[in-house]
């Protein structure tokens, strides 16, 4: 039996080191990166909604609860003020989560009223929020 160091030495003697080359992205199929890819920013750059619905405080997600709708936020826009308890903001997929909100109530789980929304008796408990940097982080 040989030692670990001897076995490692034998294995490393079989390794062929190769140079790297720069190629266009179109020519990179089935190739391996020679250096790490480093991002200059987080993606997404802020918490975003994963579904169409209403941005709310998680504590407000209670069956049959009425919430006022105080505005709307779409992808590429923002909502100026913070959400308070008992309030919601109409939100669409990819839109930034308004300040004060930490969950999305999907639209299928609500009943639209003139004065706001009511949460259905049975509703999805998930938050439906894509956290800042969940795809990749800077660095």
Can you name each region flagged by the protein language model?
Residues 1-63, 115, 131:
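Short, low-complexity N-terminal leaders and the immediately following helix N-cap/first helix
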Residues 2-4, 54-138:
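Short, glycine/charged-enriched hinge/interface segments at domain edges or termini
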């Amino acid at each position: 039996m040989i030692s670990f160091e001897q076995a490692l030495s034998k294995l490393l003697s079989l390794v062929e080191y190769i140079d790297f080359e720069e190629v266009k992205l179109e020519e990179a199929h089935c190739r391996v990166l020679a250096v790490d890819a480093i991002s200059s920013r987080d993606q997404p750059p802020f918490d975003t909604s994963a579904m169409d619905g209403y941005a709310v405080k998680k504590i407000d997600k209670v069956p049959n609860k009425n919430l006022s709708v105080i505005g709307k936020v779409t992808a590429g826009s923002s909502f100026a003020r913070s959400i308070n308890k008992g309030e919601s903001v109409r939100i669409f997929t990819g839109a930034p989560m308004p300040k004060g909100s930490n969950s999305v109530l999907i639209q299928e789980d609500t009943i639209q009223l003139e004065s706001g929304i009511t949460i259905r008796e049975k509703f999805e408990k998930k938050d439906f929020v894509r956290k800042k940097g969940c795809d990749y982080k800077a660095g």
